[in-house]
Amino acid sequence: MPARISRATYAQMFGPTVGDKVRLADTDLIIEVERDLTTYGEEVKFGGGKVIRDGMGQSQLSRAEGAMDTVITNALILDHSGIYKADIGLLDGRIALIGKAGNPDTQPGISIIIGPGTEIIAGEGKIVTAGGIDTHVHFISPQQVDEALNAGITCMVGGGTGPAHGTLATTCTPGPWHIARLIQSFDGLPMNIGVFGKGNASLPGALEEMVRAGACGLKLHEDWGCTPAAIDNCLSVADHFDVQVAIHTDTLNEGGFVEDTLNAFKGRTIHSFHTEGAGGGHAPDIIRVCQYPNVLPASTNPTRPYTVNTIAEHLDMLMVCHHLSPAIPEDIAFAESRIRKETIAAEDILHDMGAFSIISSDSQAMGRVGEMIIRCWQTADKMKKQRGSLPDDRPGNDNYRARRYIAKYTINPAIAHGMAHEIGSVEVGKRADLVLWNPAFFGVKPDMVLLGGWIATAPMGDANGSIPTPQPMHTRPMFGSFGKALTNTSITFVSQAAMDEGLREKIGVDKQLVAVVNTRGGIGKHSMILNNAMPQMEVDPETYEVRADGELLTCEPVDVVPMAQRYFLF
């Protein structure tokens, strides 16, 4: 005879189910469970006196007979594709199945087999997301990887050589020698990583050798001369090798105006960095490029969201990052031309409209690598408070908005850089790069981060304690961050040309190399999931006012944001 229990009791035991609502951290964002792939009365749970025991929820089947390596039980999945409850089966470091786990000999409707060789991660009451992807990383210090991983980032794409002045300002690794050294260093870093080569050249030869040396993309930056000739040449090389181009355009409009840059694109796909302009780009109207079908517009977290401190913070950051001198009036003018409250305010709204598609960090070069996810959700919360529910949201939840914002740092950067066949979503067949969150700490401090199906980092107490929880409790590297487990659970993204030339053997790295694919004409703004709006943009050159489809885009800065100081008292 079936038993009945209250929703509260059920949620406490097995996590929320259809119709239950969950608040994300201390924001005003509420998600609601849309569907539940588990079976009421047949839920699996690990523990003393619980279901996953021999002959009950655990079968006799071996790995060779279909049992999983790991099962995450009763997880609430938050993904661009939906918000739903399920068990997740992991095999060979990938997501093998999403559905109902258990013992097919004793339970009905089992698609995910638990056997004696299966580890269990308790997902009850936890939110599971795909690992974050940060596509704007200045590789200034290797310690960034620790900060990013501990914040829920599992893939970093960018360039640099360390604290060299070229790297402090620009996100690119110049030349095959530097690219080889950087890729070799990745064998010691628990992170999926891709490298941008320098894209600033008017002839193809030097760019071609960087792509063959392992660059998974090319970066055009104004500090190296972002002229129409360099843009055209870089995109031509990218088209030939199927790698993405990222661009930071000409703030001073020396080599041309935004129209000249757009003409140099010639309709070819390009990833536009900090499209708002405070991070750099044609002043004051680079923001206009988000209206074009070939531009994949992104912005970085220094301006996310617009607060009372945003403007004041930026001037000093710019002076340091771009090797400027406060004693030179022209340097001051350069910095001030990039900081416009009108376009920063519009940036908030364009993200909420889905006209800006990607959020990234700009790590240690104005942005904070460990705050990319936080800043994304702070923006979503600010926009809900100021603009109300989105038209596509149903009464009582913010599911559509949540899916739109999580897409900005998961699936969309993966699509933009040809990595979506491996990462970017909670999807069968993809790498098990997953993050578990306690809802109260969502987006701020993960409960666990998996790389390639293996735990890489997690909160942990005193290692000499009798249990795992005695203070000091803080995030620490786990076994997935050491030895050959590290090189067998994370990958390096490179070009197909580098794969064809045997780069792994040539430079002697242990990590698996994976080629990026479909970065050019096969994708465009239409490919940016839930973030493909292309409004007609106008920027007043005198007042800097921004309009989309004739509507003035403006909002007030906030003086309080969620996911902030209350989470970082210790």
Curated annotation (Swiss-Prot):
Q: Which pathway does it serve? A: Nitrogen metabolism; urea degradation; CO(2) and NH(3) from urea (urease route): step 1/1
User: Where's the Urease domain?
Assistant: 131-570
- Kindly list the positions annotated as binding Ni(2+) 1: H136, H138, K219, D362
Q: Which residues carry this modification: N6-carboxylysine?
A: K219
Q: Which reaction does it catalyse?
A: urea + 2 H2O + H(+) = hydrogencarbonate + 2 NH4(+)
Q: What cofactor does this chain's UniProt record say it requires?
A: Ni cation
Query: Any one Gene Ontology biological process term?
Result: urea catabolic process
Gene3D superfamilies cross-referenced by the UniProt entry:
Metal-dependent hydrolases, Urease, subunit C, domain 1
Q: Does Cytoplasm count among this protein's keywords?
A: yes
The record's annotation in SUPFAM superfamilies points to:
Composite domain of metallo-dependent hydrolases, Metallo-dependent hydrolases
Give the free-text PTM comment from the record.
Carboxylation allows a single lysine to coordinate two nickel ions.
The residues that the entry says bind Ni(2+) 2 are K219, H248, H274
List localization entries.
Cytoplasm
Write down the top EC class of this protein. Answer: hydrolase
NCBIfam families xrefs: PRK13206.1 (NF009685), PRK13207.1 (NF009686), urease_alph (TIGR01792)
Homology family: Belongs to the metallo-dependent hydrolases superfamily. Urease alpha subunit family.
Oligomeric and partner information? Heterotrimer of UreA (gamma), UreB (beta) and UreC (alpha) subunits. Three heterotrimers associate to form the active enzyme.
Protein name per UniProt: Urease subunit alpha 1
Per the UniProt record, the lineage of the source organism begins with: Bacteria, Pseudomonadati, Pseudomonadota, Alphaproteobacteria, Hyphomicrobiales
Instruction: Tell me the gene name.
Output: ureC1
